[in-house]
């Protein structure tokens, strides 16, 4: 996990105050053979609607990151994933929740992508062309840039 907590929209009040619980989330970083990766938009009616992120979802009580990732990707985008490769963990302080994002790389899956929650999807390379990018997604783009020797901006910042 990174040393610091990423604070998203720091000018906005935090729901639940300083002592709120951490919400664990399993996040799938699906990477195709050519190196492009999958981003999905947040569904209508959810916090940060329309922002782009890596797919995934909350862990249920007693569920492992891998089990949650398998379940969420089947439920949300209709695929069955192969091996799960735990990659990085990032703690993000959003106004609505304190979230621990457990990023896992996935290189193999079966099935066709079906966005079951009304979201859009896009296969991307650096710099990503979709916007706006969810704050918790930005560190992943930086990690990809470091791995790939990419030195330009990873995304466009919108206000």
Model-found features: residue ranges?
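Actinobacteria-biased recognition of intrinsically disordered, low-complexity terminal regions
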Residues: 1-11, 156-159
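Conserved N-terminal beta-strand and adjoining loop/helix that marks the start
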Residues: 6-37, 58, 89
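Active-site-adjacent beta-strand/loop module that shapes the phosphate/pyrophosphate-binding cleft
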Residues: 32, 80, 89-113, 120
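Conserved Nudix-box catalytic region and its N-terminal flanking loop in Nudix hydrolases
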Residues: 36-75
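Short secondary-structure junctions
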Residues: 76-83
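NUDIX/MutT-family hydrolases
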Residues: 105, 114-148
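Short, charged, intrinsically disordered terminal tails
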Residues: 149-156
């Amino acid at each position: 996990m990174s040393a610091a907590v990423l604070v998203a929209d720091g000018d906005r009040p935090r729901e639940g105050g300083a002592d709120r619980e951490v919400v664990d989330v399993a996040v799938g970083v699906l990477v195709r053979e050519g190196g492009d990766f999958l981003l999905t938009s947040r569904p209508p009616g959810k916090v940060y609607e329309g922002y782009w992120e890596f797919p995934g979802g909350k862990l249920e009580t007693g569920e492992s990151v891998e089990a949650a990732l398998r379940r969420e990707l089947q439920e949300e985008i209709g695929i069955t994933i192969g091996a799960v490769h735990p990659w990085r963990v990032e703690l993000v302080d959003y106004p609505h929740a304190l979230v621990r994002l457990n990023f896992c790389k996935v290189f193999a899956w079966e099935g066709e992508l079906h966005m079951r929650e009304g979201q859009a999807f896009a296969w991307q390379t650096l710099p990503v062309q979709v916007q706006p990018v969810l704050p918790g997604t930005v560190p992943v783009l930086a990690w990809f840039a470091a791995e790939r020797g990419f030195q330009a901006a990873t995304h466009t910042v919108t206000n």
